[in-house]
């Protein structure tokens, strides 16, 4: 488009947009590097080792054993310990209740707490055996326990009888001594002959008993424990036990 000079416009200052070429488009160059993932070599992973047939059988047997040991046996044992014979077994209905069978066979055992350690361990071992080898235990609990409980029960009762027979009650106390007292009884220390437990001193008001069955105040007990052997004998007549050994005296708390 042309302009005449009468318009007062300088022709050299007019831009002809129809004939000028388009300005070049500036492309923005990213500052980040472009990574070609196809050019990166793949990591090499070692192949799994080939197990021998024996190792495969061992692994398969171990997996089967872990599957055959369900958690309900452990939870059943825990419930049995806390709840006693009221808990019913979680196995199939054809299996008899374990604690119920024990209670019927031995009425003395009303709960697990009354079982001896050997009988309790027998129950735990049986439950562990059933979990590991379920195919070997087809309702044979009665036969198993009937063969094992009688011997264990006899051992348990015989040990109680031996304890009862070997126990010898102590003889009557000597004159001036007692084994039962009340608030009105005045007890004195065999060494200082002062009342026990009435002193305002914290050390002297403490009570110390001896293996020979006598009670000293805290001050006299400290002297006897730290004295030489010849001077550490119990001062009760016809006693003479040495009281300076490690476990000859212990403090009583009241």
Curated annotation (Swiss-Prot):
InterPro entries on file: E3_SLX5/Rfp1, Ferritin-like_SF, Znf_RING, Znf_RING/FYVE/PHD, Znf_RING_CS
GO cellular component, one term: SUMO-targeted ubiquitin ligase complex
Catalysed reactions, as listed in the record: S-ubiquitinyl-[E2 ubiquitin-conjugating enzyme]-L-cysteine + [acceptor protein]-L-lysine = [E2 ubiquitin-conjugating enzyme]-L-cysteine + N(6)-ubiquitinyl-[acceptor protein]-L-lysine
Localization terms from the record: Nucleus
Nucleotide-binding in keyword set: no
Residue ranges of the region described as Disordered: 1-33, 45-69
Superkingdom of the organism of origin: Eukaryota
Statement: the UniProt record of this protein carries the keyword Zinc: yes
Enzyme Commission number(s) of this protein: 2.3.2.27
Keyword line: Meiosis, Metal-binding, Nucleus, Transferase, Ubl conjugation pathway, Zinc, Zinc-finger
One Pfam short name: zf-RING_5
Biased composition (Polar residues): 1-10
Function, as annotated: Mediates ubiquitination and subsequent desumoylation/degradation of sumoylated proteins and proteins containing SUMO-like domains. Involved in maintaining genome stability where it acts in the cellular response to DNA damage. Has a role in meiosis.
Name of the protein: E3 ubiquitin-protein ligase complex slx8-rfp subunit rfp1
Organism name: Schizosaccharomyces pombe (strain 972 / ATCC 24843)
Gene: rfp1
């Amino acid at each position: 488009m042309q302009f005449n000079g009468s318009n007062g416009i300088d022709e050299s200052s007019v831009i002809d947009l129809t004939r000028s070429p388009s300005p070049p488009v500036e492309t923005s160059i990213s500052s980040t590097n472009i990574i070609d993932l196809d050019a990166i070599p793949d990591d090499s992973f070692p192949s799994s080792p080939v197990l021998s047939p024996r190792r495969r059988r061992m692994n398969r047997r171990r997996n089967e054993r872990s599957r055959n040991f369900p958690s309900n046996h452990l939870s059943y044992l825990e419930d049995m310990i806390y709840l006693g014979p009221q808990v019913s077994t979680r196995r199939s209905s054809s299996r008899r209740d374990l604690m119920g069978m024990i209670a019927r066979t031995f009425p003395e055992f009303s709960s697990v707490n009354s079982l001896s350690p050997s009988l309790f361990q027998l129950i735990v071992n049986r439950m562990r055996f059933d979990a590991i080898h379920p195919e070997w235990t087809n309702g044979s609990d009665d036969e198993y326990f009937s063969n094992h409980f009688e011997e264990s029960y006899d051992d348990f009762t015989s040990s109680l009888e031996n304890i009862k027979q070997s126990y010898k009650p102590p003889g009557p106390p000597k004159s001036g001594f007692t084994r039962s007292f009340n608030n009105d009884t005045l007890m004195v220390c065999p060494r200082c002959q002062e009342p026990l437990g009435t002193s305002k001193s914290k050390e002297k008001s403490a009570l110390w008993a001896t293996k020979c069955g006598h009670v000293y105040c805290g001050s006299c007990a400290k002297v006897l424990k730290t004295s030489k052997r010849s001077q550490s004998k119990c001062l009760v007549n016809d006693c003479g036990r040495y009281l300076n050994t490690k476990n000859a005296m212990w403090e009583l708390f009241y």
